[in-house]
Amino acid sequence: MNTNNILETIKMIEEEKLDVRTITMGISLLDCIDPDGDKARIKIYDKITKSAEHLVEVGRQIETEFGIPIVNKRVSITPMSIIAGATNETSYVEFARTLDRAAETLGIDFLGGFSALVQKGCTKGDKILISSIPEALAVTKKVCASVNVGCTKSGINMNAVRDMADVIKRTAELTKDQKGFGCAKLVVFANAVEDNPFMAGAFHGVGEAERIINVGVSGPGVVKRALEKVRGASFDVVAETIKQTAFKVTRMGELVANEASRRLDVPFGIVDLSLAPTPAVGDSVAEILEEIGLEQVGTHGTIAALAMLNDAVKKGGVMACSHVGGLSGAFIPVSEDAGMIDAVISGSLNLEKLEGMTCVCSVGLDMIAIPGDTPASTIAGMIADEAAIGVINNKTTAVRIIPAPGCEIGDMVEFGGLLGRAPVMKVNGKSSELFAQRGGRIPAPIHSFKN
């Protein structure tokens, strides 16, 4: 074993903030379906708490034995609209309470899967779940919700887009004492993936196994340090440096995933290669882009730098691990990235530039605060724009946006912890009302017909 590699890994962890962001156990709840809501909730609670009873303990053991920080232990479940749809209940808030109670019992950080997949239309259960989201997120601490409103094969469900804009507004209102924090636990997707370990968008797809272990890594600080050593070099060298660094980071993620899988006796699913920033200085995707040569993120060249970063991360990661999945790229959540926050405050980075950046990176408009009086129709337009980027480019896109109640442009919304703080950003003041009112479906793009 190469001593230099060992010392390099120790340095990456101690000085460059390398960590495993999450070990997420996916759990199928299909065998918990019951027409009696009370019985279904008992089955759900028992299945989750039994399946993941050792998850936190094993995570801590691996952290201690290997010296690798594991920030979060999480659970994802089969989309709840499928499970609860068998009942005759008119609200699924009690299901959310059951999930929250299970999460508290396990001691995990978050539980994802209060979700619905409505890219082509809504079932009765989907409609009830969507209408239940605001109250469900207001009365729970650890439950996360997501709704998939579009995909490349089906187009965009504009009725669902309009409904989700209203849901976001209502969620912000019900959690206004926390500056709309409920919206930080809610994601609207296009092309959602079934094996995502990251919150708030994780759910356990129906094509997945009974239980599965998915791991998400995090290493923006490591990539930035590596690039500091090649200042002034060509883009060829920059891309190769990022690729080699991503390889090392992913190897560590695979080690943790395999070890967790073995100890929990649960199959290993995937490693998600995503570079996930934190609010800490030196753990920022924006700082990587600035190290590549931008005075500040948001200036011209930002999208090209981000595209190269995203691609190089994927290339390095797939060489390190046979099973790569989830979102796998670079996250650009404004509130969780110190460099992004600074760029917004200085005026270098605006909402329109962020939309452009989402065309070439991992997800979409993420953890962005906007004025609390932003109309639902404007939010619907933002969701539709992001969904269109995902559907046309055959990639995952998402919107996790917080219309902060009582806040205006320039105010700072404090969330704390990994969610950080978000400067309230300006949105276009022109109306999208007539656009949002149309409803129906935007058809799938011509290049989706590949059979």
From Swiss-Prot:
<comment type="subunit">
    <text>Homodimer.</text>
</comment>
<comment type="similarity">
    <text>Belongs to the UPF0210 family.</text>
</comment>
<protein>
    <recommendedName>
        <fullName>UPF0210 protein Cbei_2352</fullName>
    </recommendedName>
</protein>
<dbReference type="Pfam" id="PF05167">
    <property type="entry name" value="DUF711"/>
</dbReference>
<dbReference type="InterPro" id="IPR007841">
    <property type="entry name" value="UPF0210"/>
</dbReference>
